[in-house]
Amino acid sequence: MENFPTEYFLNTSVRLLEYIRYRDSNYTREERIENLHYAYNKAAHHFAQPRQQQLLKVDPKRLQASLQTIVGMVVYSWAKVSKECMADLSIHYTYTLVLDDSSDDPYPAMLNYFGDLQAGREQAHPWWALVNEHFPNVLRHFGPFCSLNLIRSTMDFFEGCWIEQYNFGGFPGSDDYPQFLRRMNGLGHCVGASLWPKDLFDERKHFLEITSAVAQMENWMVWVNDLMSFYKEFDDERDQISLVKNFVTCHEITLDEALEKLTQETLHSSKQMVAVFSNKDPQVMDTIECFMHGYVTWHLCDARYRLHEIYEKVKDQDTEDAKKFCKFFEQAANVGAVAPSEWAYPPVAQLANVRAKGDVKEAQKPFLSSIELVE
């Protein structure tokens, strides 16, 4: 395995953060913790239900880590929506992360997918059965156009995860393949459409802005994720089908060239995002800016992306990019570094055990020791 290109990564990250003029002022610390705990608590009770425990069959520690990661993403990025909407989106996106981390072959359970869908029967695939049951809780927050985007994008995501089961990065010369797969599994339209709940936006009045935001968010959101997750995915056997590495294979270019290609496209997308919406409805622009800055904070602060390792590695270096990266990292940590023990309680496993014993009230008591396992 080749060495991680630390200096190159620092340079690309700094260029992105400077380009979007990163500054996260979405919450006070108290507001952030309050929203985190509200969304987490509702989602944790959802996944502690016997049906979810039986059908998902996810290792408790991994489910706990996935839930904490997604609650952070939603609360930090969807800063303008209601706490109830945050909680329902947290559940939905936790399901997607569980699927993304799965290695199960979906083929047998998908043989009669459309027949079951048409007849109104429960899906044979347990993930679809659970997601479909929860979907009404998500869609109640949105108008029909945004809802259609959420449904369609979730279906695309499932197909993208199916493709990734084959660990196929594309054939050399297949230039369209990397972006095809990334759009499929990126949830860009789902994310773009879920920024506009009907209690805040009339989708008929803002139809053009919403449509444009979905189009722009499809690329910006997934490309930023690819840049910020490049470090964690670099030497992980499960993450070798990344956009950057697929660029290397299909475009037959070097890793540095692939990373630069992604960087340039991300910067261009950021420029478009600001230029397109800067003179539109102020509420629309505010929502987009809050998402962009919160989304970056989440990546810098969440343990899943391990960017604290980069920070520790370069904090004593005297290069310009190292100093700028560390300044941005510290800026994000000042607002977004909140220990899970402050909000992610009780653990899902504890709730599930208490439910099995029939004492739900006992599950409301904080039980922090097991949380430390996934901090």
Curated annotation (Swiss-Prot):
InterPro entries: Isoprenoid_synthase_dom_sf, TRI5_ascomyc, Trichodiene_synth. It catalyses: (2E,6E)-farnesyl diphosphate = trichodiene + diphosphate. Pathway: Sesquiterpene biosynthesis; trichothecene biosynthesis. One of its GO terms (biological process) is sesquiterpenoid biosynthetic process. Its EC number is 4.2.3.6. GO terms for molecular function: trichodiene synthase activity. Pfam families: TRI5. Gene3D superfamilies: Farnesyl Diphosphate Synthase (1.10.600.10). It comes from the Eukaryota. Keywords: Lyase. Disulfide bonds: none annotated. Coiled coil: none annotated. Belongs to the trichodiene synthase family. Trichothecenes are sesquiterpenoid toxins that act by inhibiting protein biosynthesis. TS is a member of the terpene cyclase group of enzymes. It catalyzes the isomerization and cyclization of farnesyl pyro-phosphate to form trichodiene, the first cyclic intermediate in the biosynthetic pathway for trichothecenes. It serves to branch trichothecene biosynthesis from the isoprenoid pathway. This is Trichodiene synthase. It comes from Fusarium pseudograminearum (Wheat and barley crown-rot fungus). The gene is TRI5.
